[in-house]
UniProtKB/Swiss-Prot annotation:
GO cellular component: chloroplast; mitochondrion
GO molecular function, one term: transition metal ion binding
Main location: plastid
One GO BP annotation of this record: chaperone cofactor-dependent protein refolding
Region (Cpn-10 domain 1): 54-156
SMART domains attached to this UniProt entry: Cpn10
Descriptive protein name: 20 kDa chaperonin, chloroplastic
PROSITE patterns per record: CHAPERONINS_CPN10
Family annotation (NCBIfam families): PRK00364.2-2
Length: 255
């Protein structure tokens, strides 16, 4: 019986895509004759192939019990319109970063100590962007996160009242200059974001290898310099800018 060959060759003409320099297309399209060897698969070989986002899983369940130091949060509903009633396009709708804790795990073991989760069921919390796994429970959006992904507890609608967790700090960002030294007003987009501010609140500290809390080296009232692209930024009710970051992102205390 003659053997069946799984490869074949053919001559292809490939048009290379144009490159872009800024917004100007670089001219020139070249043709390349290529001899290619490829398996002769049928279309049936690709049936059932589904590409999904690896970081997000959405399923429908009626009960979810977090394990270890994980926390189940019922997320706030995305605002689809402004306070004046104008509907926002999907791209302009801000993804919520807060919600209510509805279930917690048993905690984690550090050294010889078994430490409970730092937040309780019913607490209103704020968590880091782009974290956790989304899941639908009883028709509502929920998020499963690790305790360390929770920034702090917020019992009001104003971020200035945030109680940071672990090694995090709440910082009120220094105000940006509205004018140049020559008196010209600066456009909002041209204002350079400052990387220093005043510490408003601190977390209880980091855990050592034995599960004991180590106090943070900064305290409320300190003016600190921090890494430019660190942390999560928030806007207070009065329009003030706030930053929540880890103490390891603080470079110096200013005085």
């Amino acid at each position: 019986m003659a053997a069946t060959h799984l490869t074949s060759t053919s001559s292809l003409t490939i048009n290379t895509l144009p490159s872009f320099e800024g917004l100007r297309s670089a001219s020139g399209i070249s043709k390349i004759n290529v001899s290619v060897a490829y398996p002769s698969f049928t279309s049936r070989s690709f049936r059932g192939l589904v590409v999904r986002a690896a970081s997000i899983t959405t399923s429908k369940y009626t009960s979810v019990k977090p394990l270890g130091d994980r926390v189940l949060i019922k997320t706030k509903i995305v605002e689809e319109k402004t306070t004046s009633g104008i509907f926002l396009p999907t791209a302009a709708q801000k993804k919520p970063q807060s919600g209510e804790v509805v279930a917690i795990g048993s905690g984690k073991k550090v050294g010889d100590k078994k430490l409970p989760v730092a937040v309780k069921t019913g607490a209103e919390v704020v968590y880091s962007k782009y974290t956790g796994t989304e899941i639908e429970v009883d028709g509502s959006s929920h998020l499963i996160v690790k305790e360390d992904d929770i920034i702090g507890i917020l019992e009001t609608d104003d971020v200035k009242d945030l109680k940071p967790l672990n090694d995090r700090l709440l910082i009120k960002v220094a105000e940006v200059e509205n004018k140049t030294s020559g008196g010209l007003l600066l456009a909002e987009s041209s204002k350079e974001k400052p990387s220093f501010g005043t510490v408003v609140a601190t977390g209880p500290g980091v855990l050592d290898e034995e599960g004991n809390r180590i106090p943070l080296p900064v305290c409320s009232g300190n003016t600190v310099l921090y890494s430019k692209y660190a942390g999560n930024d928030f806007k207070g009710v009065d329009g003030s800018d706030y930053m929540v970051l880890r103490v390891s992102d603080v470079m110096a205390v200013l005085s």
